[in-house]
């Protein structure tokens, strides 16, 4: 009997195979390095260690989960990120797994465009081509 984790990993292996077969993905490392070289760092550790006192909250953006099912389909990533920031979150965790969590790399990009808070990409990364 397959576990949900083994199902997720099987799906990620398929995604990696498709990415590796796609000619546009072959220069991923160079593109990633160029993006990183021009990016402003968003330092999670600094946010967690800040002297502002109180509890540090990493808020999570998630549409669904394998165990709970659909949480909410009508969520706007940018609206939620804005609310989290106003509510005092020091960072936002963004689920990007599509099949099992209803997330998307587009959610991560939209949230990045909305807030300067540090972001965590939460996904099942099994190969560097996924980054």
Residue ranges and their predicted role:
Residues 44, 67-71, 91, 97, ...:
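Glycine-rich, flexible loop/turn motifs
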Residues 39-54, 102-126:
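Alpha-helix-loop-beta-strand connector modules within alpha/beta enzyme cores
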Residues 6, 78-82, 109:
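Alpha-helical segments flanking ligand/cofactor-binding loops in enzyme cores
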Residues 60-64, 73-75, 100-102, 121-131:
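Glycine-rich beta-to-alpha transition loops that act as phosphate-gripper elements at the mouths
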Residues 8, 59, 84, 92, ...:
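Conserved, mostly hydrophobic/aromatic
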Residues 72-95, 114, 128-131:
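Alpha/beta enzyme core
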Residues 56-60, 91, 118-120:
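Structural preference for beta-strand elements that scaffold enzyme active sites
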Residues 2-72:
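An N-cap/entry alpha-helix motif that binds or orients negatively charged groups
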